[in-house]
Each structure stands twice: as C-alpha cells, then as structure tokens.
Amino acid sequence: MMFSKSGLVAVAMLGASAVEAHMKMRQPTPYSDSSLNNSPLAADGSDFPCKLRDNAFVPPSQETIAQIGEVMPLTFTGSATHGGGSCQVSLTTDLKPSKDSKWMVIKSIEGGCPANVDGNMSGGADVPDPFEFNYTIPAGIEPGKYTLAWTWFNRIGNREMYMNCAPITVTAGSSKRDAAPVAEKVEVEKRSANFPAMFVANINGCTTKEGVDIRFPDPGDVVEYDGNPSNLQPAGEAACSGTPAWTVSGGSGSPSTPSTSSSTPAGTSAGVSVSVGATVGATPTAEPESSSSEPAESEGAPGVFAPTSATVFPSTPTASAAPTSSSSGAGSESDSSSSSNGALTGPCSTEGLWNCIDGSSFQRCANGQWTTAQQMAAGTECTVGQNAQFTISATAVKPRMINAMRHRKRAHGGHRHA
C-alpha cells in the first residue's frame, strides 16, 4: 500500500503507533526469537550487536539453509515502519557476535526498507510487513555457519539503529555453476570477494539526518533502490554527522576458516548475480489489509512478486493509482541508447522513471543511470513503455505450472529442522 498523506499526517501516524510497535525480522528466523523485542538498539550502543541480552543466541528450531547464489527471503513483522529508510544485510563468522566481530556487507537497500510508505502502516506489532525483500549469498563466501544481521536506519522519527541477527548455514553452489570455465569463475569471485564493513550510526556518536533515506558510505557491490527517489540522500553527502566513538571491522572478503569446517569447496550457483550499481527490488506482495486471494508463487526477478490483479507502484506516492500514459516519459531520455531488446543504457534524466520492455522485463532510472533490465516474475507482465508508475498485471498461469512452482518451493524452502 502506498500512503499519500502530508508530512504532518505522517508524523501524527508515527507518534500514534511507534509506542506500540516497531519492526522485527521474520525471515531468516532470528536467534532467541521469543525474547527478541521490536525496539531499536540502545542509544549508547550497549546492546550492540544483535540486541545483546541474557541468552541472546539461542538457535531457532528451524535452521536457515542458504546455497551460494540462491535467492533467500528477507521479511519482517510489525507496522511502525517510520517512513522506511535504508537497510543492510551482513554476515559474520562469529556465532555469538560481539563488538569485535567482523561484519561483511552482502547487500545494501537504500530507501524503501522495510517498507516504502510515508509514515507507519496500521495493524500493530504482530502484522506481517507486506513488503518482501531478498538477499543472495554471493560468490566469495565459503560454505559454513554464519550469523546474518539485518540493520535498519529509519527515515522518520528518532535517530535510531535497528539490528536483528539470525544463524544461517551456507552451502556450496550448484555443480552446474561449479563446472563453469575457470576464467568466468575467477571474474565473478574477483568482483564479489571484497565485502565492506557494516555501517553503524546513531549509537556511537555519529547521527544520521532525519527525513532522508541514507546512502551508505560503502554499500558494496549489490545495491537496491526501493524508495522514492526524492527521499534519497543527495550523492556525496555524509551518511551521518559527528565523530563516531567506535566502528566495526570487516571488508576483506571470504574468511579462510568459517565457523564450521566443510570439505566441500566453495562454489557459486547458476543464479548468482553480482549487481554493481542500482537494482530495483522489493514490491508489496499484497495490500496491508488481509485479502482472500493468494498471490501466485514465482521464481522470476528477485523481489518482484506476482499479484492476482493489476497493481500499480508509483515512483512517488500519489493520491491516485491511475497509470500515466505510456508516452508520458518517452522521449525524455534523449541521451540514452537502446539495445536490440528495447532495454535502455546510459544516462537518464527522470529519476525514478520505469521502463517496461515487451511486458516481460523492466528497468528503472536510478542515480541518473538506467539499471540493468530484470525479468518479470512468472505469471506477471508490466505495461509496456516508460511511466512514472509501474503497473503489474497477472497473466494466466496454468495449474500445472503453479503446482510445479509450489513443488520447487517446498523442495528449496531454505529451512531444515535443527
């Protein structure tokens, strides 16, 4: 759901619900989930990392298993989304992390995380966040046991840092990818073996600016833009002000000794995608209100989910969801060049503009450049042309296809009982 309200109303919404519900990671399942509350880290950093407390690292009954290159779900519970913000996904080899732990960022989401809304959503602390995200364990990470951290810097409200942690077991990639030519594997690993350190602020003397989706000083290779471009912090502006009393280490790449040894060499999946620059990611799977319609399951482009009817995602919240004419944005990107399949490359001038290519793939103008085209999810199509609003419609999916997708999902659900 996109909220189109004035800033005053957004702040009022924030104040009304922030007391009763913040946000909490749902997938992957966190450590000590029963004792994990949805509040931010302490302002003095005393519970960093992972909201330290008694018995903070009790593993869940279901262990999260992630194959290198596999797209994994990143989902949340709660409604106090504080106008969204920016998030990172990081890994450490420490199974009981401390302030001395080394964190490796594998994905940064700048804007729209954990939801692309003006203020807060309704529903309370136990309502699933309809905006779903994902992450992929990249090449350069060795198989073994890790702690995954989700960190969030909210756009509206008190200057806070949220952090939830979950145990995760990384397994080697598919044999098909492992059999790729040596030169190809070396190039992928070269691009993805250097992971920056986790960004820390609002608990260490360096404070983020309110009202903007921060840009991380070192976001890494995989960066996703899910918010409204007008909210994104200007390029070159510092992510926080003040001198940090402390930071965390990280960034050198795959550790030589993961938390548990494995005789299987590291591999990469056929689905691995090292994205240098902007990508377009999460979209809501449904309206925040409950619906009796079940979205079609998909294995398409990461973060794009199949709605059961036409759905519109505006670049900037508007009171109306009516799509603009497909010609409204056409011709405005005169400096761009077009490939044989209709995808645009090079600079673009209308920040946030969507380009639907043949209904089966799409791209977006982000940071003045056209992103790489991504395939639509199975069972969906977009309205062809350049638009300020992105319209997704469900296509007919045969029952046999749906059953096959459900079978694959059950077979690769990403969990096993510990």
From Swiss-Prot:
<feature type="compositionally biased region" description="Low complexity">
    <location>
        <begin position="254"/>
        <end position="345"/>
    </location>
</feature>
<feature type="binding site">
    <location>
        <position position="82"/>
    </location>
    <ligand>
        <name>Cu(+)</name>
    </ligand>
</feature>
<feature type="glycosylation site" description="N-linked (GlcNAc...) asparagine">
    <location>
        <position position="120"/>
    </location>
</feature>
<keyword id="KW-0964">Secreted</keyword>
<keyword id="KW-0136">Cellulose degradation</keyword>
<comment type="similarity">
    <text>Belongs to the polysaccharide monooxygenase AA11 family.</text>
</comment>
<keyword id="KW-0560">Oxidoreductase</keyword>
<dbReference type="GO" id="GO:0046872">
    <property type="term" value="F:metal ion binding"/>
</dbReference>
<keyword id="KW-0732">Signal</keyword>
<dbReference type="GO" id="GO:0005576">
    <property type="term" value="C:extracellular region"/>
</dbReference>
<comment type="function">
    <text>Lytic polysaccharide monooxygenase (LPMO)-like protein that acts as a strict peroxygenase and does not catalyze a monooxygenase reaction. It is indeed hardly active on chitin, while being very active on soluble oligomers of N-acetylglucosamine. Cleaves the glycosidic bonds byoxidizing the C1 position. Also unable to oxidize cellopentaose. Probably breaks glycosidic bonds in non-polymeric substrates possibly carbohydrates in the cell wall of the fungus or its competitors.</text>
</comment>
<dbReference type="GO" id="GO:0004497">
    <property type="term" value="F:monooxygenase activity"/>
</dbReference>
<feature type="binding site">
    <location>
        <position position="22"/>
    </location>
    <ligand>
        <name>Cu(+)</name>
    </ligand>
</feature>
<keyword id="KW-0503">Monooxygenase</keyword>
<keyword id="KW-0479">Metal-binding</keyword>
<feature type="disulfide bond">
    <location>
        <begin position="206"/>
        <end position="240"/>
    </location>
</feature>
<feature type="disulfide bond">
    <location>
        <begin position="50"/>
        <end position="165"/>
    </location>
</feature>
<protein>
    <recommendedName>
        <fullName>AA11 family lytic polysaccharide monooxygenase B</fullName>
        <ecNumber>1.14.99.-</ecNumber>
    </recommendedName>
</protein>
<keyword id="KW-1015">Disulfide bond</keyword>
<keyword id="KW-0186">Copper</keyword>
<dbReference type="GO" id="GO:0030245">
    <property type="term" value="P:cellulose catabolic process"/>
</dbReference>
<feature type="region of interest" description="Disordered">
    <location>
        <begin position="226"/>
        <end position="345"/>
    </location>
</feature>
<feature type="disulfide bond">
    <location>
        <begin position="87"/>
        <end position="113"/>
    </location>
</feature>
<keyword id="KW-0119">Carbohydrate metabolism</keyword>
<keyword id="KW-0325">Glycoprotein</keyword>
<keyword id="KW-0624">Polysaccharide degradation</keyword>
<feature type="signal peptide">
    <location>
        <begin position="1"/>
        <end position="21"/>
    </location>
</feature>
<feature type="glycosylation site" description="N-linked (GlcNAc...) asparagine">
    <location>
        <position position="134"/>
    </location>
</feature>
